[in-house]
Amino acid sequence: KAREGVMEFLLINHPLDCPICDQGGECDLQDQAVAYGVDFSRYREPKRAAEDLDLGPLVETHMTRCISCTRCVRFTTEVAGITQMGQTGRGEDSEITSYLAETLNTELQGNIIDLCPVGALTSKPYAFTARSWELEKTDSIDVMDALGSNIRLDCKGREIMRILPRNNDSVNEEWISDKTRFVFDGLRRQRLDRPYVRRNGQLVPVSWEEALEEAINAIKGKKIASVVGDLVSTESIYALKRLSDGLNGTYECRVDGSCLPVSDRSGYVGNAKISDLDGSDNIILIGTNPKIESPVFNARIRKAWLNGAKIKLIGPNVDLTYEYSCLGSGREDIENLINDKNFILSNKSIIILGQGALADTDGFSVLQAVKKLVETFNCKLLILHVSASRVGAMDIGFTHPEGIDRALDGADVIFNVGMDEFELPKDCVVIYQGSHGDRGAHRADIIFPSACYTEETGIYVNTEGRPQLALRANFAPGDAKENWAIIRALSGKLNCDLGFNSLSELQSQLFDAFPHISKLNEISKSEWLNSDFKGFSSNLPFKVYYENFYKTNPIARASLILNNLSKSKNADNQIRAAE
C-alpha cells in the first residue's frame, strides 16, 4: 500500500507518453507502476510541464517526464567530472537543467541515457527506430580502444541499432565511451561489399575467384610482408601469421613504431590490473592522455582520485577530469625521479605508461627507465594501449625483431589486414583486406572485403592482458567474408596448408600454441624481466598520441554521428570573444 502511494505521487505530473516513448519496454517507472500502481488516476489538477534542454547531438531530452532522481547530475559530476548539470528550484518548481544552457562536454555523456529510469533522457540517433523487444541482443567486446569494454549489440534484421554497456567490475564497470556507443552508424557506411582489382589505374569490381587469382599471381615467387590494424581479432592475426610463415614472409603489428619488447610480456602489458587503480594511493601518468585514449579508463582514475589517490603527470599538459601535479614533460624527468632520494612511492602506487612515450625513436629506453622506476619503488606498471588488437598480436609473436621498417624492407607484396593509419611504400603490390573504403583501400591494388568486429566471432586481449570473447551479432554485407576465412581460402589457392577449416579448429590450434589465450576473462601472470636502462639518446618532450578522439579508425571515420560530434568539439575549442 505504501509503494502504491509513492507511485501515485510519482505519476502525478508524469505524462502519458508510454506509446511514443523510446524508453517503453525497459522503463523502471513503467515496471514499478505495473507492479505497485493503480489503473486510474485521482489527480484532476493541471499537470506540470518543463522546457526541454539542448544537451548536444547525442542526448535527447523530454524534461516533462523527469522525476528528479538526479542520477544524471550525480553521474556528470562524480564520474564524468564536469559540473554542467544541476537541479534548481524547490518543490513542484524544481527541475534538472544545464549550466547556462551549455551542451555536455564529456566523452561519457551517453551513459546518462542508461541511468535515466524514465524517458526523460534518450538517445537522439536511436530515436523512434526500434522497440526494445524487437531487438536481438548479443554480448560482445568493444574495439574502439584497448580497454576491452564489455558491450551488448542490439540488432534488428542485419543492422546494429544500438550499442549498450555490460557490467564488468574488473574492466569497464558499467560505463562505455560515446565513441563506443554511437559508432554503430559507421558500420553501415563506406562498406566494402565486393572484391576489387586495380586495372589501368582504376579499382574495378571482380568475383572472389578473380581476386584470389590476382593475389596468387602477385605473391608467387615474391617477398611478402604482412601488417595488421587495430580492430583485427587474435584468431585472424594468428591465421595470417601461419600463412606468412608458410610463405617465408615477415610480419609486424607495431605499425606506429611503438617500441614494445618482443619477448618481454611484462614490458607490453605490465604487472598491474585495471581494478588495482581502486586501491592505489599514487598514480603516475607518463606520455598519455587517458581522457582521449580511453575515457572509461580515465573515469576509473578519477574514481581513485576521489578516494584519495594523488595523480602525477610526466608529459604535455592536458585537460583531465581531476587535479594532477606535473612532474615534467619528457624523458629526463623519469631519470630524475629514479635518482631523487626525496621522492617516495608506496607499493600501492601505479605507473601508467602510454603510447605517446613508447611510439618514438627511443621508446625502448623510456620503457626500460620506467621499469627501473617500478623496481626502485616496488610499485606496479600498466601499459595503456590504444589498439584493441595489439596485445593479442604481441602475445602470438606477430612482430619483427627490428620493427616495422625492417619488416617492410624489400617486400614485393604487402598483405594489409585492416591497417589504415600508416603510409605503405609505393613500389610494391598491396593486398588490402578490410571492411571499409578508407585509406588502406585507396592505396590497394587488390581488395578483399571482410567483416568488421560485430560480424565475426573473435578474441581480443585488452590492455591489461585479459582475453575476452566477442560474439558475432550480424552478417557482413554483400560478398564480404570473415577475416580468418579469407586467409584460409588464399592459403588453399597457394597450396599452403594451415591445418584448419573452421573457426573452432583455428581456435583449438591457437589455444594449443598459446594456452593463456584460452583462459577467457583471466589475466595470466607475466614474468618480470629486470630493467636494462642505459640512458636516453634524446631529451625531447613526450607527444600527444591522439589529436582527435572521434577519428581514430575507419569505422569511426565513417560514422556521421561521430563526425558531427568531432565538428562540434572543434567548434567548442575555438577561442571566443568575451561577451
What positions do the PLM features span?
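N-terminal export/assembly segments and adjacent metallocofactor-ligating motifs
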Residues: 1-341, 356, 549-579
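Alpha-helical structural elements
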Residues: 4, 31, 128, 170, ...
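Non-catalytic alpha/beta scaffold blocks inside enzyme catalytic domains
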Residues: 251, 255-520, 576-579
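Long, low-complexity segments enriched in small/aliphatic residues
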Residues: 505-579
